[in-house]
Amino acid sequence: MKRRDFLKLAGLTSAVVATGGLMSMDKLLAQAPVVGSTKLETGMQFVGSHAKVYFTKKIDAKHLIMLYNLINESIYGKVAIKLHTGEKHGPNILPRDMVQALQAQIPNSTIVETNTLYQGDRYTTEGHLETLKVNGWTFCPVDIMDADGTVELPVRGGKHFKTVSMGKNIVNYDSMLVLTHFKGHAMGGFGGSMKNIAIGCADGRIGKAQVHGVDKDNLPADWNVWPAKEALMENMAESAKATIDYFGKHIVYINVLRRMSVDCDCAGVIAAEPTIPDIGILASTDILAIDQASVDLVYAEMNNMDLVERIESRHGLHQLTAMRELKMGNDKYELISVD
């Protein structure tokens, strides 16, 4: 399937324009969560386990590095930075200067990616390398992990998969930083840390077809016959769990909530213009907590109509349910502001 058909079928070109005034960050933080999670106030007596999610409303290199330094205790050795590097000239991808500043602070680190399932500029390794140059990802090594093959990683406790096919080079790394541009997604409803590794570490031919539940050699032309939304979320969770199980304690997560289009960065220049204001940066060692906190902050924002519609129309909240069922993290979290 060609990229333009993939995006068209996924409904990437439509958006609902939200109206209303901006909400102050203090009010926003006070209102979250609103979708059934538990945000613990600082100073509360904690009962049972909870995760720490660090937050800043300042989206710049200094604060990105600050948050990383709060969660990086377990990072060692050869470090993979899992980043969505985007289609050519994508207007919403993370700023290169921010990523470059952070990468320079992480010894022995490499940006990692995989090729795409759809036939676009990142479908082949050759095209992918050219796209990386166009988008400015030239300041450090970038490893297209499936360029030379695949590897099967086991899924512990999965009900859909026993293994998921990943880019072969993932096993060359000791640790992983999942650096995510949080935004909408055509199929998943939203793209957070879980989506970043669930689809982003799966290889472009076998693994991504597995996660989407389709035949790699015969991608359905009709969007309506692709797997049920809930099944996709569960497949994504199991794929992400395979990566998490592989790295163990040596994987951490950062979500950057800026330029949050309803469309993924795979949409490139045709992505809908964001209507929700930028919110900030989150960091955690817990994948469920950081994605739950990100969703909570989006729901608490007044100008959220198009992004919330995208999440709910794709049953995106089932991503969180699927992670809970697989015991991938904690949806009870303490949101700790560093500002």
Name every feature range the model reports, one short phrase each:
Residues G36-S37:
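Alpha-helical promoter-recognition and RNA polymerase-docking modules of transcription initiation factors
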Residues L7-L28:
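N-terminal export signals
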Residues L40-D339:
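Extended, low-polarity segments enriched in aliphatic/aromatic residues
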